[in-house]
Amino acid sequence: MWTYRCKIKKVVDGDTVDVDIDLGFGIWQMNERVRIMGIDTPESRTRDKIEKKFGLAAKAKLKSLLGPNPVLQTTISKKGEDMKGKFGRVLGDFLIEGKQVTEIMCKTGHAVPYFGGSKADTQKQHMKNRKKLVAEGVVKGAIE
């Protein structure tokens, strides 16, 4: 694991962020897409209107945690020489005041733990999270 400072450019969805990574000594890796490793969030870019509401809530939560465009730390996992996942994104997690974003997103019901495999396995937890977010008033108008 390596830790880098980075600057948030854009929150794409609840588990994907575009960043500039400070490699040190004034060297920056620009415009990298980071997949937050270890979680799955509802899709915000989908035709399913109900899922989209929860996906947009996850995106908003992540954006509020990271701030508008701050410099943060991100821990990037590296298997061998491969720092990127199957879709070419850097795999990592962000640290906010010493806490991992993955933990916060799961605790608040905006994400579920996910380490590959079938997304069908995570669906039960997503449904529990939906009920929690509706009950707390985080997501409104989500009728199933």
Report each predicted region and the residues it spans.
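Small beta-barrel nucleic-acid-binding modules, primarily SNase/OB-fold domains
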Residues: 1-144
